[in-house]
């Protein structure tokens, strides 16, 4: 009986060691599940990605604006891709390929909704890492001015390793 317990403990420790040595990989454009952080330190965490349909879901934790808190808000969205089109002799091909992405957040009791639409591709101008570059629109029901219900800007999300 003691030998069986000792064997179980040794096996358990070996499995624990293997699991601890497996490093989590940062998300990529083709495997987007994971955390992505923008310049304001807000984080979108893509928890599920269905490659067949392109559906994504997860959570967004904002560190800017009225929604700044540690409370995560639900994210829904889509990714879509077509195969890269190589250049052909005598034909101006499309020389850059990117995954396309859109995701939305409803800010609950705050009443607003934000949507990001853009691309996920390698940023050749900086680190060479993949990143999400998107434009965003935020709509809010209560503002000081009629023109202030929809705000627009741009954002960049880098993978968190």
Regions found by a protein language model. Name each.
Residues 4, 19, 82, 157-160:
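Intrinsic disorder/low-complexity detector
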Residues 9-10, 116:
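Serine/proline-rich low-complexity intrinsically disordered segments, especially terminal tails, linkers
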């Amino acid at each position: 009986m003691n030998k069986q317990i000792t064997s179980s403990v040794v096996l358990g420790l070996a499995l624990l060691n293997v699991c601890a040595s497996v490093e989590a990989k940062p998300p990529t454009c083709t495997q987007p599940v994971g955390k992505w952080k923008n310049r304001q330190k807000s984080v979108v965490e893509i928890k599920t990605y269905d490659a067949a349909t392109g559906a994504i879901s997860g959570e967004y934790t904002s560190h800017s604006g009225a929604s700044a808190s540690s409370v995560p808000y639900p994210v829904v969205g889509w990714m879509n891709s077509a195969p890269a089109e190589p250049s052909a002799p005598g034909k101006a091909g499309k020389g850059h390929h990117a995954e396309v992405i859109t995701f939305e957040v409803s800010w609950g009791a705050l009443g607003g909704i934000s949507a990001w639409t853009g691309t996920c591709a390698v940023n050749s101008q900086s680190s060479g890492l993949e990143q999400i570059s998107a434009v965003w629109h935020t709509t809010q029901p209560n503002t000081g001015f009629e023109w202030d219900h929809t705000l627009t800007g741009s954002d960049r999300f880098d993978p968190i390793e």
